[in-house]
Regions:
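Nucleotide/pyrophosphate-binding catalytic subdomain
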Residues: 1-195, 199, 227-236, 241-248, ...
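Conserved beta-hairpin
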Residues: 260-262
Length: 262
């Protein structure tokens, strides 16, 4: 579980009357902004651990993101902004294997114990790639990807790439980051990436377990996901085709008939 902290950084900065140099981990992070980011991230991590406890779930804050300074870009020192070097996947797999949810903040660490501000969308992508995740789910405050006032329910990654190339200006800054990282995830063999509104009650359940979902699903080449059917799939196949059979769109087949053709 990867969380951001931009909103909390803005809130903490207002309380201290400090103007942050950057809030999302993509621009310059000066020393005072880094300290605010550490404070805000720690607060969010703690709140998540509290909520996990309410559901009788175990979680652990981690330093699994190994980073190094982003350095100088176009002559400008990015100071305490970091670039993700790698993910300590062994640590994450150890926790997950013991039913402990790794809670990962938008902070990276180097071998000298220095802390860097990193972008949470990039962290989530790096973790998904490292763990070879089946899904990457971005939870935001928007319904998903919207074009011409219409929510896009599903989109192949190649179509999204085309829109990012030709219509980047139509994306809001928040949507653009999610879309770019979702597309990269699919290119790196994460089969699906979701962008959903976290303000919708039980939205995550609806996205994962309903046919329609509530947000936008980005998927890799669907033909790469096809595999031969197995006998254990028969019940699912019968359930999937029930509606089409009732509408006379498909011929009714018995379990034995399907099994014979597998």
């Amino acid at each position: 579980l990867v969380h951001g902290a931009a909103h909390q950084i803005e809130s903490c900065s207002k309380q201290t009357r400090h103007s942050p140099s950057n809030t999302d981990g993509t621009g310059i992070t000066d020393e005072s902004t880094l300290q605010v980011a550490i404070q805000a991230s720690t607060m969010v991590t703690h709140q998540i651990l509290e909520k996990l406890s309410i559901s009788d779930l175990r979680g652990a804050s981690t330093n699994a993101i190994v980073a190094h300074p982003k350095g100088i870009i176009q002559g400008v020192d990015q100071q305490h902004t970091g670039k993700i070097e790698r993910v300590d996947e062994r640590l994450l797999e150890l926790l997950i294997g013991r039913d402990i949810i790794p809670v990962i903040s938008p902070l990276g660490f180097d071998g000298e114990g220095k802390t860097f501000r990193v972008n949470s969308d990039a962290v989530a992508l790096a973790v998904a790639k490292s763990l070879k995740a089946a899904k990457l789910i971005y939870i935001t405050t928007q319904d998903g990807l919207v074009f011409n006032g219409q929510l896009i329910r599903q989109m192949a990654v190649n179509e999204l790439d085309e829109r990012l190339s030709s219509e980047e200006s139509l994306f809001s800054p928040q949507s653009l980051s999610k879309a770019q990282h979702a597309a990269e995830a699919c290119r790196w063999h994460v089969p699906r990436a979701h962008i959903i509104n976290g303000c919708v009650a039980e939205g995550l359940l609806a996205e994962v377990f309903s046919n329609e979902g509530i947000g936008t699903l980005i998927y890799a080449n669907k033909y790469q996901q096809i595999r031969p059917a197995k006998k254990r799939d028969i019940s699912i196949l019968l359930q999937m085709t029930r509606g089409s059979v009732a509408n006379d769109e498909l011929m009714k087949r018995t379990r034995a008939a399907i099994e014979k053709n597998i």
